[in-house]
Amino acid sequence: MKRKTGVTPALTLAALLLGLTSLPWAQEEQIRRKNVPAVVLAAFEKTYPNATIKGYSKEMDNGQLVYEIESVEGTVTRDVTYTADGTLVSVEETLEISALPPKVKAALDRKFPGGKIRKAEKITKGAVVAYEFKIRHNGRTSEIAFDPEGNELQI
């Protein structure tokens, strides 16, 4: 039996996609406070006056330049993204399991009974809210997301 060797089309596509994510316009770039638009800083400081800022970055998101502010407030870490004119794009923040909506907690317990949650985040983009988790279950770590009603989402 003759064995074919070589690169499969799927492997070629995967390599191409991985390569594209390393291009400069596809990556987040760390920046200094002075490079963040004043309206972005003002919007953040108005909403989160007690947060300690840990860093700033910018990147292209769906063809639009956005600025992200990484912060900590008590036990909550938060990444808040704005457009250059100060419009809120998204908020990603850690949360305690006790703060989960009951339907999300129930769905998580059904999907991973006895699993250990490594990270829980609430992600808000406009009016859309999702809950993302890293969970250890049966010796494997998985990532999963749910909407507020406990329906599983694709991530």
What positions do the PLM features span?
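Interaction-mediating elements
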Residues: 27-155
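Bacterial N-terminal signal peptides that target proteins for export
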Residues: 2-12
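Sec/Tat signal peptide C-region and signal peptidase I cleavage site
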Residues: 22-26
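Bacterial N-terminal signal peptides
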Residues: 10-21
